[in-house]
From Swiss-Prot:
Keywords: Aminoacyl-tRNA synthetase, ATP-binding, Cytoplasm, Ligase, Nucleotide-binding, Protein biosynthesis. Belongs to the class-I aminoacyl-tRNA synthetase family. Residues 624-643 are annotated as: Disordered. Its main location: cytoplasm. The gene is leuS. It is an enzyme of class 6 (ligase). InterPro entries: aa-tRNA-synth_I_CS, aa-tRNA-synth_Ia, Leu-tRNA-ligase, Leu_tRNA-synth_edit, M/V/L/I-tRNA-synth_anticd-bd, Methionyl/Leucyl_tRNA_Synth, Rossmann-like_a/b/a_fold, tRNAsynth_Ia_anticodon-bd. It catalyses: tRNA(Leu) + L-leucine + ATP = L-leucyl-tRNA(Leu) + AMP + diphosphate. This is Leucine--tRNA ligase. One of its GO terms (biological process) is leucyl-tRNA aminoacylation. A motif ('HIGH' region) lies at residues 42-52.
Amino acid sequence: MHEQYQPLEIETQAQNYWKEHQSFLVRELPDKEKFYCLSMFPYPSGKLHMGHVRNYTIGDVISRYHRMQGRNVLQPMGWDAFGMPAENAAMKNNVAPAAWTYDNIAYMKSQLDSLGLAIDWSREVTTCKPDYYRWEQWLFTRLFEKGVIYRKNGTVNWDPVDQTVLANEQVIDGRGWRSGALIEKREIPMYYFKITAYAEELLESLDNLPGWPEQVKTMQRNWIGKSRGMEIGFPYDQASIGHAGQLKVFTTRPDTLMGATYVAVAAEHPLATQAAQNDPQLQAFIDECKRGGVAEADIATQEKKGMATSLFVEHPLTGDKLPVWVANYVLMNYGEGAVMAVPGHDERDFEFANKYGLPIRQVIAKVEGDNDFESSVWKEWYGAKDESVLTVNSGKYDNLGYQAAFDAIGADLEAKGLGQARTQFRLRDWGISRQRYWGCPIPIIHCEACGDVPVPADQLPVVLPEDVVPDGSGSPLAKMPEFYECNCPKCGQPAKRETDTMDTFVESSWYFARYACPQFEGGMLDRKAADYWLPVDQYIGGIEHAILHLLYARFFHKLMRDEGLVGSDEPFKNLLTQGMVVADTYYRTTANGGKDWFNPADVEVERDAKAKVVGARLKSDGQPVEIGGTEKMSKSKNNGVDPQSMIDQYGADTCRLFMMFASPPDMSLEWSDAGVEGANRFLRRVWRLAHAHVSAGLPGALDVATLSDAQKQVRRAIHLAIRQASQDVGQHHKFNTAIAAVMTLMNVLEKAPNQDAQDRALIQEGLETVVLLLAPITPHICHVLWGQLGHAEAVIDARWPSVDESALVQDTLQLVVQVNGKLRGHIDVAASASREDVEAAARANENVLRFTEGLSIRKVIVVPGKLVNIVAN
């Protein structure tokens, strides 16, 4: 055993052992309790960043802990390999996305290996490989035949630079999230997953996920957005519109129907199109609306604009004529693309009506308090729907509360055939068509005679050609006759293959299930293996995936269940959302007002007495730089730390220990070079103590029955650490406090005597405990030390230590003694001492006597096991 801790040598030794013994290869063992631990798989961007390192280290610590509990643990890894960045890199470097992707995977896999992760690499999946996506295509054809996937024209966000459709979430402030181009609205045929058919179940079954953070469940509930209301028909005014019909609107507030003063329709609505035929100004406004974003977030923040048409509809209860307006805040894909406007009781309508001078009618009044209604100032109570308000100015519906008005107006509308109660969801169907090359081909053939024909199972997969270098102008597949020319599977006539590819969220919606049986060729999943491993027991990933990825994965799990592929309802039992990794930022302001960011490694900082950074200079020129505060590590702020350089300098165990110690996993982690140094120092201390102990020869067995009082205290410290770490790692994922408990134990062991055989046997137990408690966190050093401490089996096969409760029992207790509430001494008493004995010992304490001399003792308060307070005057 080397005298010095040499991480690179140790880590190579441990990793070679795991490889040779296939230590992390697992199979289904029906008689053994399973534990499936999964971290969200990475996009193969080229290099791991610290966010990855944190994510995968957390997963690895949890996996290794459960293995030490005797469970059959699966921890797989794969690559979310389709997507736009590969196309961008391909254009930049003039290389096929496939080649770029596979090179990145090879490098990142070696990086993951160097971290010492307990991954079963035999289950690796790569989503851009045909043996993976063929089953996605197979499921697509099944769902298309069942009507769960359908094709329709959709209004989409068109990015004119990337020449592709963007999801609402990819449009930020009306611009494309990658290109920054102003987004246009376009109508194109697209394929949709009918996720709305599962909206109710997706909402309800959130209640069956107690292991998920409440915040994530709330975000999903809001995204699904269930609301109860009515669909109301406003009959067309035939004089202005020219024919009969109804404008249908959905509202959650039919109780305010008597306050409707106009209706607003989306730019794409048929009435808008009709009104614009002879109105160039209106047509220009409609074109402007179509260029705006279609994301709800954009619509909420953008300026509300509208234009009157020459058309009218009739109020369904009064018959009054209401003008039809075109407004940029009405979405064609929400309900029927029309809303009734009640400016008196809806803040958005109120602003709009004031802006364009439209009538505002009060139909709800506050029962008490400030109940003045002013049409120029919005007050919170205008929008209330509780017992604080009643209807007014509503004819026969006056003096009713929200529910009573809802029911009365609803009944009359139903009787006239102009309304029905409905539940609506905010959730929209999931459009998955992408006009991109590097994605999974949609398995549909377009035939003039037969329509859209799914590719038969025996002709799957539809393989994406991998040697294409995109040029950035639209989809390359649409320019490749060798890809799209084919014959119709139904009639045999010449036909055309679909050239759109699927949204890459599709691949990540079912990968967790394929890990159960990645080599299975008889279907999408091997039901037996899937039912053994699923659901995932612990899923780990960033909070930024709270809505889309996690919702789509839950949806897909239910689709697979309904196809008979899995037996469970939900994919992830427990969810841990890890915090970001943040670091200091430094910059100089450039001549044009921009910022030049400098990496912390290139900056020298000056600290005050409290170690706070008070100044910073660039190492290269010695000139000052501005301090920008701590921010998430990113390329744009140039504050990332390369994990590889850290591993090369200190070893993976130091990196892992720092990551787990610096903060609880769900909080942000602030990068600190001093913290990394500290983690490394601690591992050197562990090594030093073990080396000194092993060099003196391993001791015999510990005889617990003959321990001295001092030795009992050392053994108590050992078992306190086990108890603390077991709670922190096993129950709460508080790895930082578990590590703190081990550090406390190390302090005790370093000071413990090692004179006789019992002393040395006690240090042996202490070091074994340190190694076992650290084994999930710093596996390499623990692998080597476990062998040095005399164990033939590997530490990964050792059991997590259990607490010996008898070691925690104290024969004597040290109590605090106070006089009139002030600390005046300590006493040692037998743990079994009576109250009288404790009081007598306190009164007899030398220091206490000094402070009670000449005073009469009024009373003595004894808090068992803690303190004695003598009240004297």
